[in-house]
Amino acid sequence: EGCKPCECDKSGSRLEQCNLYDGQCDCVDGRGGRDCSQCPEMSWGDPFLGCKSCTCNPDGARSLYCNKVTGQCECPRGVTGLNCDRCDRGTYGALPQCIPCGECFDNWDKLIAQLRDEAAAQLRIGTEIKLSGPPGAFAKEFEELEQVLMDMKSHVNSANVSSDQLENIDQELDNLSSKLKDLKPNLASHGSRTGEASVKISELYSRVLNLQSEFNKSSAKTKELRENALEIQEQDVSGAYASIQESLVKSSALQAKLTDAENSKNISVYFRTSVEHFLQNSNFSDANSENGNENSLDKVVEFMKAVDENVSSINTELCGGTGSPCHEDCGGAMCGKCGGELCGDGAVTKAVEAKNTSRKAEELIKSKYRSTSSTLSELENSNKQCKQATAEAKNNAHEA
């Protein structure tokens, strides 16, 4: 690149000659910079009027050096202020931990920026209309336009954001409304330039209506999301309640069946006791009573058959299998098991199924309750963070 002149400041350098490699001039006390025309390191301002020390916050600034002209310290993202001594708009917390407010604030911030841009655009168009002169045929449209602007201002004021954030928009809307009112006395005297004014008025009217439509869509969408969330929660809980009711009906029916089975069991015990008593009191060793014993034995056999049939019926009712011989899956009396997954007709199996169904329904209710509580807690925390971010943004705006 070749050689470059030193250009050392005569009032701030000791010599006109600079360093041959980096071009740094030899500065006198109280001067700094490459050519000695600025304040020294760690200070800023006009050296002829007096330099000021940099006061960068060590917790918030990237370094202790500041801009030599403005004194602005170099702040990381999320930190602001001349000295980088406070959290920026859209964040909360304490230095150096400035935490972003999150999606809630970001969405509102984008909406506010859009509104600010739209208001500025309407202001420019209104000024152009005033210069070009709108025709008298559009007096009615101007009245409707003023009404739309008033409605827009009402929407903005009712939004859940700080007044400082919307102050510029309100002011611009007021200015635009005032300018439109100033145009009214001149409507009759400006009948020319109809084509140009028609296009501009139509464009202005359309943009303001679109702006109002965006507010309405945003409000409707929020309401729809809240209603949908509530409806889903109610449907889930009602479904779980219906499941419990169904399980209760099944349990009641099975309880009655088990009661009948228990009665049958008591009867079989009575039969067994009677047989044992009968055998103990019978004498089969007497040869003279051979015919009588034979008749008695026949009665015992018939009696035992009846008992066996009764026991098989009880096994089927309780376990789902006859039990004689022992059923491979369902078991039975004296078989070591009773009921199972493949024994759907048994009272024991049905009772277990009903109990499991009730337990699952209970767990479902608890799960939905925990989910609902968690969702409500998140919504409350999000709303709290939005309000906190709005308050901090308002305070930051006042401090700035």
From Swiss-Prot:
Record keywords: Magnesium included? no
Q: Does the keyword Repeat apply?
A: yes
Please give the GO cellular component terms listed in this UniProt entry: extracellular region
For region Domain II and I, the annotated ranges are 101-400
Q: Which UniProt keywords apply?
A: Coiled coil, Disulfide bond, Extracellular matrix, Glycoprotein, Laminin EGF-like domain, Repeat, Secreted
- Regions annotated as coiled coil: 140-235, 353-400
Q: Where is the composition biased (Low complexity)?
A: 371-383
**Which pairs of Cys residues are joined through disulfide bonds in the record?**
6-18, 8-25, 27-36, 39-51, 54-66, 56-73, 75-84, 87-98
- Tell me which InterPro entries the record gives: LE_dom
Q: Where is this region: Disordered?
A: 369-400
Q: State a single Pfam family of this protein.
A: EGF_laminin
PROSITE patterns, per the entry: EGF_1, EGF_LAM_1, EGF_LAM_2
Please state the protein's primary subcellular location: secreted
Transmembrane residues, as ranges?
none
Locations listed in the record = Secreted, Extracellular space, Extracellular matrix
Which residues are in the Laminin EGF-like domain? Answer: 1-5, 6-53, 54-100
Tissue specificity here reads: Individual glial and muscle cells.
User: Sugar-bearing residues?
Assistant: 160, 175, 216, 266, 283, 310, 356
Q: Note the superkingdom of the native organism.
A: Eukaryota
How does this chain assemble? Answer: Laminin is a complex glycoprotein, consisting of three different polypeptide chains (alpha, beta, gamma), which are bound to each other by disulfide bonds into a cross-shaped molecule comprising one long and three short arms with globules at each end.
User: Domain comment?
Assistant: The alpha-helical domains I and II are thought to interact with other laminin chains to form a coiled coil structure.
Q: What does this protein do?
A: Binding to cells via a high affinity receptor, laminin is thought to mediate the attachment, migration and organization of cells into tissues during embryonic development by interacting with other extracellular matrix components.
Q: What is this protein called?
A: Laminin subunit B
Where does this protein come from, organism-wise?
Hirudo medicinalis (Medicinal leech)
